[in-house]
């Protein structure tokens, strides 16, 4: 799980870097808020459209090769951002257009990460620990987001925004080296995992024959059963709403701190770490809470209660924080709203494994596609609402959609796989 958290942290770094360096880019090239929203959306469309293909590839070929290709792709995209203005000038292209193309490509690369990490969790964790393990995965994203604002702001101030992207690219390459050195697709393939540990991970299911059986099954994803399942539709639509709210924090918190709350660059960067610190802490707590309830009342109740609690508290905090005038109270409340969003989010990923244990990467890809369509809509809609109706109204809409996420998740029955469902 340590390597999974590292990959998620580096993913956060390469996704969030534009949100911090974006203020400097905006000033250098004369972009307005709506144009920056288009650049943010470009990443998310690439990220959303390639979730399902990457999920299938991971189920078919395993996370080892899939994540290697993924990290190389988005690391290359980060490096290209630094040279984009020079390329645009020499080719006679619009810098805005080239930024959008590169961020789309970066999104394509990052699209494999979450489905592949879910596949790792499905292969490497015990049934009773899925919620907590999924929380650690999401917590890795939070840890990366905690460090990124200060790291990117510091490197941008001292060395320029281009250097910040080159550093992100270099860290991605280092992560590939670590991943290839230590990871395997299955616990059975790892030299340091013994028979007792295999029995603890998947009791009675660690033989080579069983591994080959599971690999063969993964080649035929039961899409019809998935797409006719009320649980799957509840899951993916709820995650679409979650994605809308999540990308308000992810893309716009720094801009909000600078433009609305009047903070300076480093001060805003420090505050921008707060939502991700809250995510890093509360995501594993949400997974642990869900696992604990699941052992007492069943997985359906465990996942639903955790999502209801997380999304409900998140909506209240976001709504209250957006209308408070006192910055030192408002920003922590909005940061905690992000944290409780992720208290719930770990249970979405765990539910992918609950519903489709042998096809978890494919279902995760489907879910994350819808989630990031919500995020892409959020990136543009939040900018539009902020410009035309004010930031309070933009955040009110995000709070309302957060409530919708919790309500839609009520249809998810994590106690029954899609293959067990009567036809």
Predicted regions span which residues?
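C-terminal transmembrane helical hairpin of 12-TM major facilitator-type secondary transporters
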Residues: 300-347
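Cytoplasmic helix-loop-helix junction between adjacent transmembrane helices
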Residues: 102-142
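Helix-loop-helix hairpin linking two adjacent transmembrane segments in secondary transporters
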Residues: 141-190
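Central cavity-lining transmembrane alpha-helices of secondary-active solute carriers
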Residues: 41-56, 273-286
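Extracytoplasmic
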Residues: 3-31, 249-254
């Amino acid at each position: 799980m340590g390597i999974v958290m590292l990959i998620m942290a580096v993913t956060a770094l390469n996704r969030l870097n534009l949100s911090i360096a974006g203020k400097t880019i905006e000033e250098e090239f004369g972009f307005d808020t709506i144009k920056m929203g288009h650049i943010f959306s470009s990443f998310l469309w690439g990220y959303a459209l390639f979730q399902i293909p990457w999920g299938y590839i991971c189920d078919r070929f395993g996370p080892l090769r899939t994540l290697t290709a993924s990290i190389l792709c988005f690391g290359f995209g980060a490096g290209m951002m630094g040279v984009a203005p020079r390329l645009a000038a020499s080719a006679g292209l619009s810098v805005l257009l080239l930024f959008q193309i590169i961020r789309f490509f970066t999104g394509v690369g990052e699209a494999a990460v979450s489905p592949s990490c879910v596949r790792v969790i499905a292969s490497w964790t015990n049934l009773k620990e899925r919620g907590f393990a999924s929380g650690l995965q999401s917590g890795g994203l939070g840890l990366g987001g905690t460090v990124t604002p200060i790291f990117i702001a510091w490197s941008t101030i001292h060395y320029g925004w281009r250097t910040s992207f080159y550093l992100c690219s270099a860290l991605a390459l280092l992560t590939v080296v670590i991943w290839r050195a230590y990871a395997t697709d299955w616990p059975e393939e790892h030299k340091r995992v013994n028979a007792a540990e295999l029995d603890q991970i998947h009791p009675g299911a660690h033989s080579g024959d069983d591994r080959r059986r599971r690999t063969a099954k993964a080649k035929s994803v039961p899409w019809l059963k998935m797409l006719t399942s009320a649980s799957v539709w509840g899951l993916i639509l709820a995650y679409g709403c979650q994605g809308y709210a999540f990308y308000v924090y992810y893309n716009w918190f720094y801009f909000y701190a600078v433009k609305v709350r009047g903070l300076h660059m480093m001060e805003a960067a420090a505050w921008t770490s707060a939502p991700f610190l809250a995510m890093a802490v509360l995501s594993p707590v949400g997974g642990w809470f869900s696992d604990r309830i699941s052992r007492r009342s069943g997985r359906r109740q465990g996942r639903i209660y955790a999502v209801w609690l997380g999304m409900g508290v998140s909506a209240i905090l976001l709504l209250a924080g957006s209308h408070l005038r006192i910055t030192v109270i408002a920003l922590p409340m909005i940061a905690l709203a992000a944290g409780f969003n992720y208290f719930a989010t770990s249970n979405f990923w765990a539910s992918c494994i609950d519903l489709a244990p042998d096809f978890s990467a494919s279902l995760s890809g489907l879910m994350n596609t819808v989630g990031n369509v919500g995020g892409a809509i959020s990136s543009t809609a939040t900018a539009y609402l902020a410009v035309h109706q004010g930031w309070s109204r933009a955040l009110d809409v995000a709070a309302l959609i957060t409530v919708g996420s919790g309500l839609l998740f009520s249809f998810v029955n994590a106690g029954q796989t899609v293959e067990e469902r009567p036809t």
